[in-house]
């Protein structure tokens, strides 16, 4: 357990509860508090998680928005879900209002707090959260394409018969329709992925579609995704809290492009400590610029 490691999770839904559950068993938090506008949901989740906490050393309880604002790390999972046939702009409008209320309720937010946004559209909402909170851009991070990258590495691990943790490959850009895979920079054991005989046989478009479409397939079959993103959010908290200096693809403000989207970033106590520029082919750079254009076209980023 790390001294001064209080984590607040805003949102007691499936993603918030999954994040709390995954984080509990890392035994790095002095305390986890859960905050939600629905007191019954908070009580139910805390009671249920407290049973699991009996085999963990992490206290968990309900908390207030004001307490959340004084936590070391604030994980925002509360947000409206996209309705069937609803335009993306309408979802942004609804989640903007939710985010504005959340951040307003937490004020004053600790000047050294780290905010992790785990709500879609995550790139846009991370940008908005940074603006509303008044914190420095390096202190406000979105989950971005971390889960997409994990899915890609698992998929490639199956193809190349190697542990996914030994694969260095990234999904970059917007977490959404315009995200892209940096194939040229991908490697296994220091050897470029493009140099493997199997690479020539890869259907890269099919892989990209499978990675970006996996969430919708899960939603179609059971209504929502939460375990995977909860585990990823907990891992990001772990990385920051232990100052691990690990590199993950997360939503960050990238000055070169003038937008918030996913690039590999070194994470530690101060949040984002360094953003790494991935070598891309001309075709890949063009795809990344499509992400930039898609995000800049959104009214709330203007």
From Swiss-Prot:
UniProt enzyme class: oxidoreductase
Intracellular or extracellular location(s): Cytoplasm
Keyword list, A-Z: Cytoplasm, NAD, Oxidoreductase
Name under which the protein is recorded: L-lactate dehydrogenase B
GO CC aspect terms: cytoplasm
Binding site for substrate: 88, 120, 151
Role played: Converts L-lactate to pyruvate.
Subunit field text: Homotetramer.
Family that this chain belongs to: Belongs to the LDH/MDH superfamily. LDH family.
Catalytic activity, EC: 1.1.1.27
UniProt-listed PANTHER family: L-2-HYDROXYCARBOXYLATE DEHYDROGENASE (NAD(P)(+)), L-LACTATE DEHYDROGENASE
An example Gene Ontology molecular-function term: L-lactate dehydrogenase activity
Gene encoding the protein: LDHB
Organism for this UniProt entry: Rhizopus oryzae (Mucormycosis agent)
Family annotation (InterPro entries): L-lactate/malate_DH, L-lactate_DH, L-lactate_DH_AS, Lactate/malate_DH_C, Lactate/malate_DH_N, Lactate_DH/Glyco_Ohase_4_C, NAD(P)-bd_dom_sf
């Amino acid at each position: 357990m790390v001294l001064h490691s209080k984590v607040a999770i805003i949102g007691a839904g499936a993603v918030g509860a999954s994040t709390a559950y995954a984080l509990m068993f890392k035994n790095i938090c002095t305390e986890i508090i859960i905050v939600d506008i629905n007191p019954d949901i908070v009580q139910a989740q805390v009671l249920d998680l407290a049973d699991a906490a009996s085999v963990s050393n992490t206290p968990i309880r309900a908390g207030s928005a004001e307490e959340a604002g004084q936590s070391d790390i604030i994980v925002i999972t509360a947000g409206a879900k996209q309705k069937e046939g609803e335009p993306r702009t309408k979802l942004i409008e609804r989640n903007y209002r939710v985010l504005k209320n959340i951040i307003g309720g937490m004020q004053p937010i600790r000047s050294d707090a780290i905010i992790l946004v785990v709500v879609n559209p995550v790139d846009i909402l991370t940008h908005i959260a940074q603006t509303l909170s008044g914190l420095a851009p390096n202190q406000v991070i979105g989950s971005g394409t971390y889960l997409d990258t994990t899915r890609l590495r698992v998929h490639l691990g199956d193809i190349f018969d190697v542990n996914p943790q030994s694969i260095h490959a990234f999904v970059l850009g917007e977490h959404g329709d315009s995200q892209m895979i940096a194939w040229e920079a991908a490697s296994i054991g220091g050897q470029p992925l493009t140099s493997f005989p199997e690479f020539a046989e890869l259907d890269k478009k099919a892989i990209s579609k499978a990675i970006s479409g996996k969430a919708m397939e899960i939603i179609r079959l059971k209504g929502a995704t939460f375990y995977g993103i909860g585990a990823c959010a907990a891992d990001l908290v772990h990385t920051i809290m232990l100052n691990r200096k690990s590199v993950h693809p997360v939503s960050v403000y990238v000055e070169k492009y003038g937008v918030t989207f996913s690039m590999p970033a070194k994470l530690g106590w101060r949040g984002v400590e360094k953003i790494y520029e991935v070598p891309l082919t001309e075709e890949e750079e063009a795809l990344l610029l499509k992400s930039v254009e898609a995000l800049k076209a959104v009214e709330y980023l203007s």
